[in-house]
A protein has these predicted regions:
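Alpha-helical cap/lid subdomain in secreted, periplasmic
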Residues: 1-163
């Protein structure tokens, strides 16, 4: 997303270089070419991070989703529109979004571990954890709750059933 996060990701994952959009485009195409012997390949778009469609992180993700869509079209590969389907569901939100994605590590960890505690210790569903934080699909603004998982399940099931 930015230079610092790219450097951190490179270091934490022992990558040879900082991930870039240009490398993503190139490597996605190469990966599909390597998988060409597999009879059926399907790509899916990336889910949002946070639930504000016009946030800078989701604008960044849209760039990658456009690349995924274009690659699927160019290579004649099926596409599961995960992102579009999740945004459609977010339009059905029954309560206002209270806060949105904060890229700082400490707030992310608080949301993740807080969600885990509420789910596993207090036995709240992921959707209830999300609701308690003013979220609809992403209980910690990153990971899907049951509502979001059902959308991806239905997309996948429909794709498998159709062919």
């Amino acid at each position: 997303f930015n230079k610092n996060s790219g450097e951190r990701y490179k270091r934490n994952n022992s990558l040879p270089e900082v991930p870039t959009f240009e490398n993503y485009q190139k490597l996605l195409s190469e990966l599909i070419d390597r998988l060409s012997t597999i009879p059926k390949i399907v790509l899916c778009t990336l889910p949002p991070i946070g639930e504000h469609q016009n946030s800078s992180i989701n604008q960044h993700i849209n760039k990658f989703n456009d690349c995924i869509k274009l690659t699927a079209q160019e290579k004649n590969i099926s596409l599961l529109p995960v992102s579009d389907s999740l945004w459609d569901e977010l339009d059905k939100r029954l309560y206002p979004l209270r806060s949105d994605y904060d890229p700082n590590t400490l707030p992310i960890l608080r949301r993740i571990y807080g969600g885990i505690i509420h789910h596993y210790v207090f036995k709240k569903s992921w959707d209830k954890v999300a609701e308690s934080k003013g979220q609809w699909l992403l209980f910690d603004q990153i990971h899907l709750g049951e509502r979001g998982a059902k959308i991806i399940y239905k997309l996948t099931k429909n794709y498998i059933s159709s062919g």
